[in-house]
């Protein structure tokens, strides 16, 4: 995230240095859209900081199609987005799946270090999300027994990591003050 922040600052400097005075309106609109996106990312870094306060940022698998063109809410890169996969997994799809599922234990170990701001409401929803992920991974493991049995141990290891992360969230959540983060 530090690298992203540094790159954002550099891109913002470059954007401000662009003289748009002679541009047609349509290109000026594009410029302002880019500026707005950069401002949004800056807001994420300065205010929201989902990587340090929201366990749901560390989603590892999702099964549903979003109801909007892009995914809603912050999420880490590399989520297993199940609608993208066709079973049995083959070729590049299988390689990508393996890479992402193998990263789950590493990702969640890092998440424990990154989650330094403890917001009770956000952590509660993170616990619910991890329970769903455990159920999805359990079902996926059963499905892969028929189509890709070689992947079952990787999915089981990921499920164990999610279970361990959920237990850690529950333990930490239990010791938090009963205050609200002001969600909603």
Task: Explain the meaning of each model-derived region.
Residues 1-184:
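N-terminal maturation segment of proteins
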């Amino acid at each position: 995230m530090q690298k992203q922040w540094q790159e954002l600052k550099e891109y913002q400097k470059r954007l401000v240095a662009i003289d748009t005075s002679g541009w047609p309106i349509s290109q000026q609109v594009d410029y302002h859209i880019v500026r707005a996106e950069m401002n949004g990312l800056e807001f994420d870094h300065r205010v929201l900081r989902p990587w340090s306060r929201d366990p749901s940022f560390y989603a590892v698998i999702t099964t549903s199609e979003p109801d909007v063109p892009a995914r809603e809410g912050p999420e880490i890169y590399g989520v297993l987005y199940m609608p993208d996969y066709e079973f049995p997994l083959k070729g590049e799809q299988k390689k990508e799946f393996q890479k992402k599922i193998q990263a789950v234990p590493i990702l969640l170990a890092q998440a424990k270090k990154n989650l330094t701001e403890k917001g009770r409401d956000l952590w509660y929803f993170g616990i619910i999300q991890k329970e769903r992920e455990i159920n999805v991974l359990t079902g996926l493991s059963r499905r892969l027994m028929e189509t890709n049995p070689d992947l079952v141990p990787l999915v089981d290891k990921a499920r164990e990591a999610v279970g361990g992360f959920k237990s850690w969230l529950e333990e930490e959540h239990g010791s938090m003050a009963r205050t609200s983060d002001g969600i909603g």
